[in-house]
Amino acid sequence: MGTSRYQGIEAYVGRTPLVRLRRLSELTGCEILGKAEFMNPGGSVKDRAALGIITEAEASGRLQSGATIIEGTAGNTGIGLALIGHARGYRVLIVIPDNQSPEKITLLRTLGAEVMTVPEAPYKHPANYNRVAQRLAEEKGWVWANQFDNTANRLAHYSTTVPEIWKQTISSCGRKDYSWDCLRALTWEARCVWPGNAAPARPL
């Protein structure tokens, strides 16, 4: 069978447009832009994190065919993991507090995830949904996404979000009225755009 011109769902994560926020721009006298992350397949910026976490786990060998991905989440990271993990053939188990809406739980299941609800508990409590996910991963040998401490989460933005914003705004950065703002905003991003760059001698 020939190669299809269509791609899997993960190919459509990112490359979201910048939208001018007209009223805020007029109120402040600045050009204020919003990155339309709701246009990702799962409807949020967390699709980038999910794709980055899964891709890094595959590259490291921790995530292999037939593996289970588990995460404790009450937010959109679970949706991203369900969407991308299921598309790549993994079992995805989301541990979620029982005070979340039935609609969110239904959506997770519709996207292919299994859902375990647990009573709400403080973050550091052993019964907290994130701690339950960690414990089950250790006991069962599953892959814990660990979004809060997983550097692949942040690196997903270094490798995708930052270059996108740079490309989408570079045409404006040459203008005199934009140059200083662009310099301040992009100083920390330079490590991604030009990985060999050193940090500035002093903060801007």
Q: How should these model regions be labeled?
A:
Residues M1-L204:
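PLP-dependent amino-acid enzyme catalytic core
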